[in-house]
């Protein structure tokens, strides 16, 4: 078993860490940064960019630059959140087997495939850092992710060529990093406000045990939403001044997004910032510029309800844990959005305690995941992690009621059974609709899947005994089975959630990813050959211009023709590596005569060497 990396697959940024030498270490990417933007871009030349390189070209390529893909991970296309995402994101969201997917240049990609490209970049960078192959990982998800979102995350890891040993909740991971060396028992609250999700978890740590007491949150609340409030404000102000709706222009919207995010960050340390976007759009009267001052007070008023929503979640989670505010020993702040001063102020005022900001909010989740990797590998001894299911699980029963089998807050892994019966006389089959949520009626909860148990022996209603068993593994992924206790017939479903991917589709995506990896390597070789050719052509042209007079006309023309041929090859986007190398070789051969001429000129210009036997001295 090689090294297991811990990955925080974030909405905005991702990070990775490894446990080695009895400590968890953050792994820097190839650019030397500890975090990698969770952005994937498709260029017109067919290249796929991931991370910083994708982020840099987002303004000029908004419709093919994919960010915040985590927000539609495992989401059904007909859900309200999908419609909301569709309005906010510049790329095209489409329906694929009922689930959300995206369309780029006529090709449909699932969120798993896009996330896999981010994971592949992290995997490759980790391999470069560690100097060995990486095949196993622990990946974190928001605590409030439902079953389909967790399954989709695991599928993304599989497509990226990773064996995902465990899916772990982000706040739990942060607590693991924070509380591993705590010997005394204490109750801590992790407030995790990231780029796209919010979680709050109350845990008990001590004696190397990390136990989740309660968790809650919102899988669709994060820094992106704070940015969107600023975007809406700027767009509204601009429209009232010019009559132009700039949100309809995808390139302008991307510029607005970047400006809003930068303004939010600047207002964490400044009381006022200026947003200056020249030539944001144009009308019949000419170009338009967006220039607007934004104060911290205005930003706080725009986002006040979002902050208050997080406070109400804190209140309910502490209540679910059976505690009072006074019993919370520490509040650990996690996620980049916790840098917002008002967020810190509101949490501190509610809990009435100083906040623990000793952990790096961008890195601590990945660090915790690497520790869990160390536990699974056996490098970390005597650490027990007790996580819980964030939502209740059950089935639909007579009258459209949700009957719970596993309650919210149950420690996982868990296995529970309940016996049900038929609703009609001589009913030959029962349909098991698996649900997740806290509402009383089935229709108000999330449907995870459905299966039928056939072949029930004829009997009056209420007589057959159908045992339904829910089995949640340590990743929080669910298997449901039903057995007729009279006939012994059984049926089960491993909930694949709303991801809509079959095993064969996942396998195909894994192969596609591998093929793409080889294709990317080939493209890189062509780019390197083109760069080398361009450099040689430039240097040779410069030398030829300087030393042309030292060459005879035929040699000079031969070299110039070779330079021109190589430049034409460099400009040809369809030129192969072999063609570039051949033309480069021809120029190098032709340029040898130029090198000889330059050497001859240098020799001729050097002063005549003095006789070594003659001694310079003054003579009286």
UniProtKB/Swiss-Prot annotation:
Family annotation (CDD domains): ASKHA_NBD_HSP70_DnaK-like
Q: Which Pfam families match?
A: HSP70
Query: Could you tell me the keywords of this UniProt record?
Result: ATP-binding, Chaperone, Nucleotide-binding, Phosphoprotein, Stress response
Location of the region described as Disordered in the Swiss-Prot/TrEMBL record: 597-620
Q: Which residues carry this modification: Phosphothreonine?
A: 197
Induction entry: By stress conditions e.g. heat shock.
Q: Which domain of life is it from?
A: Bacteria
Q: Which GO terms describe its molecular function?
A: ATP binding; ATP-dependent protein folding chaperone; unfolded protein binding
Please describe what this protein does. Answer: Acts as a chaperone.
Question: What family is this?
Answer: Belongs to the heat shock protein 70 family.
Which protein is depicted? Chaperone protein DnaK
Per the UniProt record, the source organism is Helicobacter pylori (strain P12)
Q: Which gene encodes it?
A: dnaK
